[in-house]
């Protein structure tokens, strides 16, 4: 009989010696409060052609020194980040404050801000790389796949109080992977073609050698051993080169959720941030209560990722280690109901309630396809519609 907590690996520990792991201990900063922070990636698009514009260097230079605005791998991208916040609503207002001036500079240069998982028709071969050693090294190693990374996403950090909680929470969060991807899926197009997927970004990003689903380690020491092995064998030089869809950020004391496609508007972003915040805090509190968190076998987790990427809100997902299945939107309703008390305690009840609006109005990939159909397949109209959704 399967234990009530779900699937458990007999041992997932890396092969490194205990002495090696001790010498390479990773300190976790710890967050005394369950804080939240957001990283929001934007593409720059030409106001006339609606194609991508490689002008991020000039835009960031005009913005000036600002810890809330960062460069990224490609020169068509700027990243806007929040500070350390107490709630989803606070994070959204923080982002709004930064976006206003940044958007005015972008407009003055004849461009628009655009955020989706992929651009509907841009070609990766015309995009320019940001001048930085770490990006050059990434492309040198990954070659064709690295140059294909014409993708944008949303990353959410949630503070965790102890390193001992991190890996159990990450493993349990994988049960909600398809919910988050289906809700945020916004990348049906690739190079002007409809891929048939709700999130082609999810399929693309996992091609990088250290990206994709995390290993389901049970303890922090197992994660330390994994990082030791990765460094010793030359796979990574720094821990931030582990690009998992959910990963620890030890220096910040957070778990970073990197599942979601790019999000076009602040209301949906606030809803998704609230959902992720509530999920992590709920699991954290269940650990405090002595509960063993439920997990699923990695083959179920992998299948759920694919189903959500392919079918979006129409995905029938695997729920547990017993292989029970359910439509993702039906299960989402129960998840939202269960998280309502958590949301009230985190002052994000309104934002969490807004999650239910996404299936009602259609996720971004569905809205994009509707616009394309209404405009005889003109993908510039899709870009227009998405730009209009960014109401600051």
From Swiss-Prot:
Q: Do the record's keywords include RNA-binding?
A: no
Single biological process term from Gene Ontology: modified amino acid biosynthetic process
Q: Does the keyword Nucleotide-binding apply?
A: yes
* Disulfide links within the chain: none
Keywords (alphabetical) are: ATP-binding, Ligase, Nucleotide-binding
Q: Name one Pfam family in it.
A: GCS2
Ranges for region Disordered: 1-21
The catalytic activity of this protein is classed by the Enzyme Commission as 6.3.2.2
- Reaction(s) catalysed by this chain's protein: L-cysteine + L-glutamate + ATP = gamma-L-glutamyl-L-cysteine + ADP + phosphate + H(+)
Q: Which SUPFAM superfamilies match?
A: Glutamine synthetase/guanido kinase
Give GO terms: molecular function aspect only.
ATP binding; glutamate-cysteine ligase activity
Q: What class of enzyme is it?
A: ligase
Composition-biased stretches (Low complexity): 9-19
Family to which the UniProt record says this protein belongs: Belongs to the glutamate--cysteine ligase type 2 family. YbdK subfamily.
Q: Briefly, what is this protein's role? A: ATP-dependent carboxylate-amine ligase which exhibits weak glutamate--cysteine ligase activity.
Q: Write down what this protein is called.
A: Putative glutamate--cysteine ligase 2
Task: Give the organism the record lists.
Answer: Mycobacterium ulcerans (strain Agy99)
Give the lineage: Bacteria, Bacillati, Actinomycetota, Actinomycetes, Mycobacteriales
């Amino acid at each position: 009989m399967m234990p009530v907590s779900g699937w458990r690996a007999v041992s997932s520990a890396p092969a490194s010696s205990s002495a090696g792991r001790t010498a390479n201990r990773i300190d976790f900063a710890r967050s005394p409060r369950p804080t939240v922070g957001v990283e929001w990636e934007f593409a720059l698009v030409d106001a006339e052609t609606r194609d991508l514009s490689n002008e991020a260097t000039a835009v960031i230079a005009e913005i000036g020194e600002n810890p809330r605005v960062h460069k990224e791998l490609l020169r068509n991208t700027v990243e806007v980040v929040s500070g350390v916040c107490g709630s989803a609503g606070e994070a959204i207002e923080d982002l709004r404050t930064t976006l206003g001036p940044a958007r005015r500079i972008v407009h003055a240069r004849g461009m628009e801000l655009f955020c989706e998982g992929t651009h509907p028709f841009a070609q990766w071969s015309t995009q320019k790389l940001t001048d930085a050693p770490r990006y050059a090294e990434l492309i040198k190693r990954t070659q064709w796949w690295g140059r294909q990374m014409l993708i944008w996403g949303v990353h959410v950090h949630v503070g965790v109080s102890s390193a001992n909680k991190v890996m159990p929470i990450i493993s349990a969060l994988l049960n909600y992977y398809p919910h988050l991807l289906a809700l945020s899926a916004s990348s049906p197009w690739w190079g002007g073609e409809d891929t048939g997927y709700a999130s082609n970004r999810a399929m693309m990003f996992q091609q990088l050698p250290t990206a994709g689903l995390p290993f389901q380690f049970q303890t922090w020491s197992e994660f330390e051993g994994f990082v030791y092995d990765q460094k010793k064998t030359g796979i990574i030089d720094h821990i931030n080169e582990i690009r998992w869809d959910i990963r620890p950020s030890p220096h910040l004391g957070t778990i970073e959720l990197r599942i979601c496609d790019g999000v076009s508007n602040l209301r949906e972003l606030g809803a998704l941030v609230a959902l992720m915040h509530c999920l992590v805090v709920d699991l954290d509190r269940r650990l405090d209560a002595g509960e063993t968190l439920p997990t699923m076998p990695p083959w179920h987790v992998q299948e759920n990722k694919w189903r959500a990427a392919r079918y979006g809100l129409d995905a029938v997902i695997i729920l547990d280690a017993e292989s029970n299945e359910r439509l993702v939107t039906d299960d989402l309703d129960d998840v939202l109901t269960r998280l309502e008390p958590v949301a009230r305690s985190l002052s994000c009840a309104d934002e969490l309630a807004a999650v239910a609006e996404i299936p009602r109005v259609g996720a971004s990939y569905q809205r994009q396809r509707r616009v394309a159909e209404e405009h005889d397949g003109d993908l510039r109209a899709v870009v227009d519609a998405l730009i209009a959704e960014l109401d600051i």
